[in-house]
Design a protein with these regions (language model features):
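Oxidoreductase and adenylate-handling cofactor-binding alpha/beta cores
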Residues: 166-186, 199-211, 252-258
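Glycine-rich beta-alpha junction loops
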Residues: 33, 120-121, 193-198, 235-237, ...
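Terminal low-complexity tails and localization/encapsulation signals of metabolic enzymes
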Residues: 1-2, 216, 232, 297, ...
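N-terminal helix-loop segment corresponding to the beta1-alpha1 unit
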Residues: 1-182, 331, 335-346
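Glycine-centered positions within short beta-strands or beta-hairpins
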Residues: 60, 184, 320-322
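Aromatic-enriched alpha-helical interface/lid elements that frame and gate functional surfaces
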Residues: 221, 226-302, 306
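Short Pro/Gly-enriched beta-strand edge/turn motifs at strand-loop
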Residues: 36-38, 208-215
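Conserved Rossmann-fold dehydrogenase catalytic segment
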Residues: 122, 150-159, 181-197, 216-223, ...
């Protein structure tokens, strides 16, 4: 399957990369001379390239095209005729202005799945507003629930709205491709960052609806589960996630406090939520006495979810199953001649 990636920055390129990770031929279309803006987002740099760019553009080929020129537009149309999926994230109407919108390209290739990613959707009063992840984290309420109580707003440490949007885009693309097997027809997909941000709030949004009150910032704590947070040990921080009553019944003996099981304030989770401050104070004294590794090992032995709070270098050493890298992130225009040759233009 061929994917035409005419997107830039994060949400679109990440979606296209996920399709590349699945083994599909992804052609990244970039402006001559500058390319994707993230190529200039640094430091840090790695082998002369932006680390940011490298993180979201593996398993792609790079083609430079000036989509504002008639020649570039014609080459793009040739590619679209031979592609299964197109991903773009220009302002609504941007691709139409170049004769490369859904209406034009679907006439050339009725099987094309055309995915447009924007901040606020293709229609409606906000469609022309500019959008970056930070703005959506703020507007969709994410920054109101992130950080410590009483502290200034904090953004999530990575661009989660962009990443959620990419996952929703891939989900819709794969669904459209499956539907195409039945109907023979492609589809226009309208994926917005705002919709993705609101949908991903899940239980926090439902909590607000249920209570009529906006949730506040709680640091690492959970609004509905106690204890479920970070704790300070003798030499650092770790987390414990007591997400059910059976886990609570294993947790208390494991930490040497079996009497908590019969304490009238802690018998069940609603009571523990109500008396959160009292329980946290008791646990803080206990956990301060031993190092992180001992607590994590002990809790894990008793089947209680627990983990150290790692920095990223430590996290990257954890056992995992990384995506297969068939192609490293391409240099700007690295595959232009190759792709043009495939089109019979060289």
């Amino acid at each position: 399957m061929r994917v035409l990636d005419a997107s830039r920055v994060l949400a679109g390129p990440y979606a296209a990369m996920m399709l590349g990770d699945l083994g599909h031929d992804v052609i990244k279309v970039e402006a001559p001379g500058t390319g994707d803006p993230t190529r200039a987002w640094g430091p840090p740099w790695q082998d002369g390239q932006s680390a940011y760019y490298l993180s979201i553009n593996r398993n792609k080929r790079s083609l430079t095209l000036d989509l504002k020129s008639s020649e570039g537009q014609e080459i793009f149309r040739k590619l679209a005729r031979q592609s299964d999926v197109l991903i773009e994230n220009f302002h609504p109407g941007g691709m139409d202005g170049w004769g490369l919108g859904w209406e034009a390209l679907s006439r050339l290739n009725p099987r094309l799945v055309y995915c447009s990613i924007t901040g606020y959707g293709q229609t409606g009063p906000w469609k022309d507003r500019p959008a970056y992840d930070l703005a959506l984290q703020a507007e969709a309420g994410w920054m109101s629930i992130t950080g410590e109580a009483g502290a200034p707003p904090v953004r999530v440490g990575v661009a989660v709205i962009d990443l959620f949007t990419a996952h929703f885009a891939v989900q819709q693309i794969l669904s459209a491709l499956l539907d195409r097997e039945r109907t023979g027809a492609g589809r226009r997909l309208d994926v917005s960052m705002l919709d993705s941000a609101i949908a991903s709030l899940t239980y926090m949004a439902q909590n607000a609806r249920a209570t009529g009150e906006p949730p506040g910032r709680m640091g690492s704590r959970h609004p509905s589960i106690v204890p479920y947070q970070a704790f300070q040990a003798k030499d650092g921080w770790f987390v414990a996630a007591v997400g059910s009553q059976p886990i609570w019944e294993r947790f208390c003996p494991a930490i040497g406090l079996p009497d908590l099981l019969t304490h009238p304030d802690f018998r069940d989770n609603p009571l523990r939520v109500k008396h959160r401050a009292l329980l946290e104070a008791l646990l803080a004294k206990v956990f301060a006495a031993r190092p992180v590794a001992e607590w994590v090992a002990l809790l894990t032995e008793h089947d209680v979810p627990a983990a150290p709070v790692n920095d990223l270098l430590a996290a990257l050493e954890l056992p995992s199953r990384p995506a297969a890298v068939r192609l490293p992130p391409p240099r700007l225009g690295e595959h232009t001649e190759e792709i043009l040759g495939e089109l019979g233009l060289r």
